[in-house]
Swiss-Prot record:
Biological process annotations from GO: translation
Keyword Ribonucleoprotein belongs to the record: yes
Gene from which this protein is expressed: rplW
Species in which this protein is naturally found: Lactobacillus johnsonii (strain CNCM I-12250 / La1 / NCC 533)
Matches recorded under InterPro entries: Nucleotide-bd_a/b_plait_sf, Ribosomal_uL23-like, Ribosomal_uL23/eL15/eS24_sf, Ribosomal_uL23_CS
Function statement: One of the early assembly proteins it binds 23S rRNA. One of the proteins that surrounds the polypeptide exit tunnel on the outside of the ribosome. Forms the main docking site for trigger factor binding to the ribosome.
Keyword Ribosomal protein: yes
Name the record gives this protein: Large ribosomal subunit protein uL23
A Pfam family matched in the record: Ribosomal_L23
UniProt superkingdom: Bacteria
Subunit structure: Part of the 50S ribosomal subunit. Contacts protein L29, and trigger factor when it is bound to the ribosome.
Example of a GO MF term: structural constituent of ribosome
Length: 98
């Protein structure tokens, strides 16, 4: 499996943006991905050294359309911590609004 198939997209929330200051980056990953696969994929794609990987499963939410109920797809998030001597991941511009 290719590394770009494992990492789906970065998670862009206020909390994940604040974690970037501590060299922690949040990504949506494949539901079947393991910590080792996520670590290897991040190191290959971004050319950084990974210190730790934390993974959490997010359940799908119930949604209604009229009288019909359904669920959104479940997903898996990975919070990747980089080593102190590693480079930052350049996902966005360095412009920060104050």
């Amino acid at each position: 499996m290719d590394a770009r198939d494992i990492i789906l997209r970065p998670v862009v929330t206020e909390k994940s943006m604040n974690l970037m200051d501590d060299k922690k980056y949040t990504f949506d990953v494949l539901v079947s991905a393991t910590k080792t696969q996520v670590r290897n994929a991040i190191e290959e794609i971004f050319d950084v050294k990974v210190k730790n990987v934390n993974i959490m499963n997010v359940r799908g939410k119930e949604k209604r359309v009229g009288r019909y109920t359904g669920k959104t797809a479940r997903r898996r998030k990975a919070i990747v911590t980089l080593t102190e001597d590693s480079n930052d991941i350049k996902i966005f511009n360095d412009n920060k609004e104050n």
